[in-house]
C-alpha cells in the first residue's frame, strides 16, 4: 500500500495454518518481489518486515528464530524461482507454444542474466 501505509501478507495460493516463515520467505524473495514489479528489497527492508510481522504475533515466536527460518525458505524460493525460469525459457523457444506473453518472457530473461544470477549467488550462497 506504500510508504507509511498498512501492508498485509495474505496467502491466496494455499490458505492454511502452517509455517509462517515459509510464507514470509516466499513473499520476500527477489524471485517474487521482482516478478511483476521492479522491486528488489534490501536485506534491511526484509528484516524490518519480519520484525513488524513478529511484533504482531503477540510474542508467540522469537524474532531470531523466525528470521532464521525465513532466510532458509527465502533461499530455497530463489532456487525454485530461477530453475522455473530456466524451464520456462526453454518452453518459450518453441514457436508453436500456445501461450506467449512478452512481459513474462522478458522477466524470465531478466532472471537468467549473469548479473541477476550472480546477485542471487552472492546474496544467498557466497
Roles of regions detected by a PLM:
Residues 17, 43, 68-72:
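Amphipathic, non-membrane alpha-helical segments in soluble helical-bundle scaffolds
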Residues 5-8, 40-48, 99-111:
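Glycine-rich, flexible loop segments associated with nucleotide phosphate handling
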Residues 1-22:
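Active-site acidic catalytic loop and adjacent metal/ATP-binding pocket
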Residues 37-40, 64-67, 94-100:
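Short, surface-exposed loop/turn segments at secondary-structure junctions
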Amino acid at each position: 500500500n506504500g510508504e507509511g501505509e498498512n501492508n498485509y501478507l495474505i496467502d491466496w495460493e494455499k490458505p492454511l495454518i502452517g509455517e509462517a516463515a515459509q510464507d514470509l520467505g516466499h513473499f520476500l524473495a527477489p524471485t517474487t518481489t521482482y516478478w511483476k514489479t521492479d522491486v528488489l528489497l534490501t536485506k534491511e527492508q526484509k528484516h524490518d518486515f519480519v520484525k513488524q510481522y513478529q511484533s504482531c504475533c503477540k510474542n508467540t515466536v522469537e524474532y531470531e528464530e523466525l528470521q532464521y527460518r525465513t532466510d532458509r525458505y527465502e533461499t530455497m524460493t530463489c532456487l525454485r524461482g530461477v530453475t522455473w525460469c530456466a524451464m520456462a525459457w526453454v518452453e518459450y523457444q518453441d514457436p508453436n507454444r500456445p501461450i506467449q506473453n512478452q512481459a513474462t518472457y522478458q522477466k524470465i530473461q531478466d532472471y537468467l542474466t549473469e548479473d541477476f544470477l550472480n546477485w542471487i549467488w552472492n546474496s544467498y550462497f557466497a
